[in-house]
From Swiss-Prot:
Transmembrane segments: 10-30, 124-144, 151-171, 177-197, 213-233, 237-257, 328-348, 355-375, 390-410, 412-432, 472-492
Main location: membrane
Modification Phosphoserine occurs at: S4
Organism: Oryctolagus cuniculus
Family from the record: Belongs to the major facilitator (TC 2.A.1) superfamily. Organic cation transporter (TC 2.A.1.19) family.
Keyword terms, alphabetized: Cell membrane, Detoxification, Glycoprotein, Ion transport, Lipid transport, Membrane, Phosphoprotein, Transmembrane, Transmembrane helix, Transport
InterPro entries assigned: MFS_dom (IPR020846), MFS_sugar_transport-like (IPR005828), MFS_trans_sf (IPR036259), Orgcat_transp/SVOP (IPR004749)
Underlying gene: SLC22A8
Name of the featured protein: Organic anion transporter 3
Glycosylated residues in this chain: N86
Region (Disordered): 518-542
A GO term for molecular function: organic anion transmembrane transporter activity
Catalysed reaction, written as an equation: estrone 3-sulfate(out) + glutarate(in) = estrone 3-sulfate(in) + glutarate(out); estrone 3-sulfate(in) + 2-oxoglutarate(out) = estrone 3-sulfate(out) + 2-oxoglutarate(in); glutarate(in) + 2-oxoglutarate(out) = glutarate(out) + 2-oxoglutarate(in); urate(in) + 2-oxoglutarate(out) = urate(out) + 2-oxoglutarate(in)
Length: 542
């Protein structure tokens, strides 16, 4: 008897599973708010130097650039007891008295003057948030294996609520960055535990549906954020609004049961059996639950217990040529996806369109993108879908270099298309990665791959700083990396309709067999090629 059969006996998709998925899905709505929050809390409005004391703003104070616009970071020098310069050729100086912002929104940029020479700090704040997600993935995965999925999930809800709320009261930028790091750290634990607890409590045939449903919760969260930001123009209140609900989620998480597999592997089989019986009662199958025994439960997870005893490390991902190829190609694809995705997702204000409307469009494109990805995965295969998604995204980003800034509609269309392709790339990678790595090292492979996505998302904001050298440099970097990631994906083996490999040897045999099957039709075609024989009265046929 397998664990899936035990799950069928207690109700594989009953009221419990619907409640379970709902409890896991609702907090994901708020994760989109935190991931993309700096789009609105760190908006840079138009600004110019504050005039010196006893002087009013005007062309005699503020120089004009080549485009006829007021300089944002310079003003004319005013010598004591001298007349003000009346042309743009006078000596200039930085904004010594601060800036005037043409906006009613209150952001971290306007509060701490993150403009001109300090504009790099804005991108650094987002990178530090992404660094928190990266470190959280490295640390919390191990803690989850030691202490269980549910305690980590509950603690991360509390940490996100506390650190997010504390961010709203940050007196200085460094303290703001520390709390944002903790927000990212906790988000990583929420993502990890949500994925595992969803997969382990629903039947195999329903996993794709429930995973997609939880994924769409993130998409819906992207619709909610612009509405909240529009209604709450003060960044501190907006930060507090998206953080406080996690105090409630931490209380609701007590209704989420622990992973049965983890309980059995941790030697807590009796507790696992009690939980299964409660689930059976909730699903209206109390009698079936009472019939379950510890022996049946342990027997159903015997394979998991055996695999848990085997010791595998990150080094095993590079043990064989096939695993090395898979690990390196997937790492590049994950890095490219995270790197390019956040270049577009966090660059909403660069396209000259209302940021609230554009964010809704950016969120909305995920719906058709994920649907098209599912169809492509089912009919065209994994490596074609993955390669095409990244290559098309890279082409769209590179195309932005050749579109003038005043053609905002065309630039927006290209950005939305690229963002949709990258959303599809993420959806494909989660499935593709889990299918490529053998069972004995799948969790390690998924973890390393996810780390590369986080590294990409952490570096992505910093690349925008290169735009100070030449405006087109960031898009060249983003687009080229996406093209490289897509090209790497084309070197991965196809997994469509293939059984999942259990061991490293299974993976080697499977790859060699698939390679052999590809060569057989080619050999057969070659054998069927009959050379043309000359014919005619003067031909010797002996």
């Amino acid at each position: 008897m397998t664990f899936s059969e035990i799950l069928d006996r207690v109700g594989s998709m009953g009221p419990f599973q619907f409640l379970h998925v709902a409890l896991l899905g609702f907090p994901i709505l708020g994760m989109a708010n935190h991931n993309l929050l700096q789009i609105f809390t760190a908006t840079t409005p138009s600004h110019h130097c504050r005039p010196p004391p006893n002087a009013s703003a005007g062309p005699w104070v503020l120089p004009v650039n080549q485009n006829g616009q007021t300089e944002r970071c310079l003003r004319f020098v005013h010598p004591p007891n001298a007349s003000l310069p009346n042309d743009t050729q006078g000596a200039t100086e930085p904004c010594l008295d601060g800036w005037v912002y043409n906006s009613t929104r209150d952001t971290i940029v306007t509060e701490w003057d993150l403009v001109c020479s300090s504009n790099k700090l804005k991108e650094m704040a987002q990178s530090i948030f992404m660094a928190g997600i990266l470190i959280g993935g490295l640390v919390l995965g191990d803690l989850s294996d030691r202490f269980g999925r549910k305690p980590i999930l509950t603690c991360c809800y509390l940490l996100l609520a506390a650190s997010g709320s504390s961010t709203a009261f940050s007196p200085t930028l460094p303290i703001y960055m520390v709390f944002r790091f903790l927000c990212g750290f906790s988000i990583s634990g929420i993502s990890l535990s949500t994925v595992i607890l969803n997969v382990e409590w629903v039947p195999t045939k329903m996993r794709a549906i429930t995973s997609t449903a939880i994924g769409y919760c993130y998409t819906i969260g992207q619709f909610i954020l612009p509405g909240l930001a529009y209604a709450i123009p003060q960044w501190r209140w907006l930060q507090l609004t998206v953080s406080v609900p996690y105090f409630i989620f931490s209380l609701l998480s007590w209704w989420i049961p622990e992973s049965i597999r983890w309980l059995v592997l941790a030697g807590k089989s009796s507790k696992a059996l009690k939980i299964l019986r409660r689930v059976a009662t909730f699903n209206g199958k109390k009698e079936e639950g009472e019939k379950l025994s510890l022996e049946e439960l342990k027997l159903s997870l015997q394979k998991d217990i055996s695999l848990a005893k085997a010791k595998y490390s990150t080094a095993d991902l590079f043990r064989t040529p096939i695993l090395r190829r898979v690990t390196l190609c997937l790492s590049l694809a994950w890095f490219a996806t995270g790197f390019a995705y956040y270049s577009l997702a966090m660059g909403v204000e660069e396209f000259g369109v209302n940021i609230y409307i554009l964010q809704i469009i950016f969120g909305g494109v995920d719906i058709p993108a994920k649907f098209i990805t599912i169809l492509s995965l089912s009919y065209l295969g994994r490596h074609i879908t993955q390669g095409a998604a990244l290559i098309l995204a890279g082409a769209a980003i590179l195309s932005l270099i050749f579109v003038p800034m005043d053609m905002s509609l065309l630039r927006t269309i290209l950005a939305v298309f690229g963002k949709g392709c990258l959303s599809g790339s993420f959806s494909c990678l989660f499935l593709y990665t889990s299918e490529l790595f053998p069972t004995v090292i799948r969790q390690t492979g998924m973890g390393i791959s996810n780390v590369w996505a986080r590294v990409g998302s952490m570096i992505s904001p910093l690349v925008k700083i290169t735009g100070e050298i030449q405006p087109f440099i960031p898009n060249i970097i983003y687009g080229t990396v996406a093209l490289l990631g897509g090209s790497a994906a084309l070197f991965l083996p196809e997994t469509l309709n293939q059984p999942l490999p259990e061991t490293l040897e299974d993976m080697e045999n499977w790859f060699l067999q698939s390679k052999k099957l590809k060569q057989e039709p080619e050999a057969e075609k070659a054998s069927q090629r009959i050379p043309l024989q000359p014919s005619g009265p003067g031909v010797d046929r002996s």
